Swiss-Prot record:
Cysteines paired by S-S bonds: none
Keyword check for Chloroplast: yes
HAMAP family in the record: ATP_synth_epsil_bac
SUPFAM superfamilies assigned to the protein according to its UniProt record, in alphabetical order: Epsilon subunit of F1F0-ATP synthase N-terminal domain (SSF51344)
Name of the gene: atpE
Protein known as: ATP synthase epsilon chain, chloroplastic
Family annotation (InterPro entries): ATP_synth_F1_dsu/esu, ATP_synth_F1_dsu/esu_N, ATP_synth_F1_esu_C, ATPsynth_dsu/esu_N
NCBIfam families: ATP_synt_epsi (TIGR01216)
């Protein structure tokens, strides 16, 4: 049995096909979703979406949004997303280093919040690019 997974950003569809299982980063922690999962609606955190296709795991970097799960269908609406395989690890690492420097230099509450969000996005991209599918 499978799940139909659809991951959408405001500009494009990132994923739309059947999967065996997912592990989703939510605002209250990670949840695993298998076929016949209880209906759920949840906020999606900045983090990794792990997708299992048979014996292979793929990753997507998600930049926050919402997910609806029910009737073996998962719809995830996010601000932005990238497939881990599309992310250049060196570029992602450079972006992380810049984000860390910007957080150290941040002054004022707003700058610190924005720098912290940029750092979380950069860490997520690095993690997604470094994940090896098995």
């Amino acid at each position: 049995m499978t799940l139909n997974l659809c991951v959408l950003t405001p500009n494009r569809s990132i994923w739309n096909s059947e999967v065996k299982e997912i592990i989703l980063s939510t605002n209250s922690g990670q949840i695993g979703v298998l076929p016949n999962h209880a209906p759920t609606a949840t906020a999606v955190d900045i983090g990794i979406l792990r997708i299992r296709l048979n014996d292979q795991w793929l990753t997507l970097a998600l930049m926050g949004g919402f997910a609806r799960i029910g009737n073996n269908e998962i719809t995830i609406l996010v601000n932005d997303a990238e497939r881990g395989s599309d992310i250049d690890p060196q570029e992602a690492q450079q972006t992380l280093e810049i984000a860390e420097a910007n957080l150290r230099k941040a002054e004022g509450k707003r700058q610190k919040i924005e720098a912290n969000l940029a750092l979380r996005r950069a860490r997520t991209r690095v993690e997604a690019s470094n994940t090896i599918s098995s």
